[in-house]
């Protein structure tokens, strides 16, 4: 069963590396993380794009620019998994979440 993680992202550079590590270790090769970027004025977008280049499970998409709820809705619309987890941009996942 394919798992999708939907993330609404806005200036989360301070947390993104640790967060992705805690998420990706729990996902299989067929799973995905959809990151809807509503803004990254903290300079973190290049880091996100590099992470997506290095791990094909990460997909970075343009956010709608209309707040966190619309940004989550955008991420969810792009998910293709049977199970969808939501992740705020500063979540650190416990090892047994998935």
PLM regions: where:
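Cell-envelope/extracellular polymer assembly enzymes that use nucleotide-activated donors
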Residues: 2-4, 32
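Acidic donor-binding/catalytic loop of UDP-sugar-dependent glycosyltransferases
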Residues: 43, 91-98
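Active-site acidic Asp-centered loop
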Residues: 38, 87-89
